[in-house]
């Protein structure tokens, strides 16, 4: 019975820790609005609902977005 209680307390503490970490990341003033963090690439990406421009190829937020290298500033196309 003591083991079960210990496991439940541990699980609760882990859930609280993860929730606190997530809320800190969302509320962090260094986390600019209009950008999202791409964990795979380790960079902030500019978000746009439709269209928009990007200064670098990795600035497009939506996964299906492709930045044209022919135009300057590059144009984001969403597929």
Curated annotation (Swiss-Prot):
Keywords: Acetylcholine receptor inhibiting toxin, Amidation, Cleavage on pair of basic residues, Disulfide bond, Knottin, Nematocyst, Neurotoxin, Postsynaptic neurotoxin, Secreted, Signal, Toxin
Subcellular location: Secreted; Nematocyst
GO molecular function annotations of the record: acetylcholine receptor inhibitor activity; ion channel inhibitor activity; toxin activity
Pfam families per record: Conotoxin
Propeptide residues, chain positions: 24-46
InterPro entries named among the record's database cross-references: Conotoxin
GO cellular component: extracellular region; host cell postsynaptic membrane; nematocyst
Disulfide bridge partners, by residue number: 47-61, 54-67, 60-76
Main location: secreted
Protein origin, superkingdom: Eukaryota
Residue numbers carrying Tyrosine amide: 78
Annotated signal peptide: 1-23
Function: Alpha-toxins act on postsynaptic membranes, they bind to the nicotinic acetylcholine receptors (nAChR) and thus inhibit them. This toxin very weakly competes with alpha-bungarotoxin for binding to orthosteric sites on muscle-type T.carlifornicus (IC(50)=14.95 uM) and human alpha-7/CHRNA7 nAChRs (IC(50)>45 uM).
This protein's domain notes: The presence of a 'disulfide through disulfide knot' structurally defines this protein as a knottin.
Additional remarks: Negative results: does not show activity on rat TRPV1, human TRPV3, rat TRPA1 channels, the human ghrelin receptor, human neurotensin receptor 1, rat ASIC1a and ASIC3 channels.
The protein, known as: Alpha-actitoxin-Ms11a-4
Organism for this UniProt entry: Metridium senile
């Amino acid at each position: 019975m003591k083991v079960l209680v210990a496991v439940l307390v541990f699980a609760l503490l882990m859930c609280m820790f993860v929730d606190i970490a997530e809320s800190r990341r969302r509320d962090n003033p260094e986390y600019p609005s209009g950008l999202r963090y791409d964990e795979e690439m380790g960079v902030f990406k500019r978000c746009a609902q439709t269209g928009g421009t990007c200064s670098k190829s990795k600035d497009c937020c939506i996964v299906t977005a492709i930045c044209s290298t022919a135009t300057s500033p590059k144009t984001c196309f969403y597929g």
